[in-house]
């Protein structure tokens, strides 16, 4: 039985606003499923990864100020950045100024390159409106990465 893991891409909803959301413009790879239980870091099992072109809406950061403070204060990476400074940064981002910011991730440079805005008061409205945005996963990138993974793990 060959061990594999499946990776998809999420659209991180960064902040909920009155009439919509701010989201991270670039879709980010995450591990979705596996047939093994040998997790290492961030659900990565260090086995062959098959990337699929699925987008998942991830509301991880779209919380109240109190909830976000609790999240990042208890996060395993809470020593990797200044929590108070980042929370203040998050609080001050809004619909009129979000385009002024880049490299949004608290400690991984270029992971979250920039924000974009999507209208929608409910999750259903946000998803419906995100479908019309130009968010996609490069097919050539998927193919190349899947071929590399196949070759890498074929001879292990």
Outline where the language-model segments fall:
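Catalytic-site signature of metal-activated, phosphate-bearing donor transferases
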Residues: 1-156
